[in-house]
Amino acid sequence: MPKKIVKAFTLIELLVVVAIIGVLTSIGVVAYNGFVKSAQKKTVEINFNNTVKYMQSEIAKCKLDKDAKAFSLPCPVKVQSNYQECAAVYLSWHYNIKNPLATKETAGWIASKNNCPTFVYGDWRGGVRSGDGQRDGDVNIVICPRNPYCSSNLDTDGKFKVMWWWDNIKMQGYKIINID
């Protein structure tokens, strides 16, 4: 009776295949993480551009109708802390602007308890912030002059400054918003 030869992979061949799969997996994980970070940064840049656009349209709404409301406050928009705070809260929740890096909050909290209380049903933190306390992924609104964001000069005094942060809290871009 002739012997039947069974062909199979050797242990070395199997180990080489496992090693190749491991290397490809580690390359894939690194590439995926880079893709995620790039997408998150692009999201924050879009949040910044939308914040500027929506803020300007709220201000324009007041110019068209003095009886309207901007950021849930009466027109005209004023360069005051309550408008700054309410703009951040309103833009975050009315336009669904989120910081993609922010940790989740407990559902059912109130944003801005003083000037424009907003009950938050979801478990996320707004992506537009009022004043200091910036984090990567945030869009912040301040009133100029405000150290260290904008020094006192005729081009910025009495105006809002909208900024966005990334790469260990480095300002990536800004826009001065004039209400006139």
Q: For each predicted feature, which ranges?
A:
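Membrane-proximal N-terminal amphipathic helix
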Residues: 37-67
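Generic N-terminal leader/processing signal
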Residues: 1-5, 40, 173
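N-terminal single-pass transmembrane signal-anchor helix
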Residues: 3-33
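Intrinsically disordered/low-complexity terminal segments and short unstructured peptides
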Residues: 9, 24, 37, 42, ...
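Periplasmic/extracellular, small/polar-rich flexible segments of pilin-like filament-forming proteins
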Residues: 60-180
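Extracellular/lumenal glycan-associated surfaces
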Residues: 34-37, 165
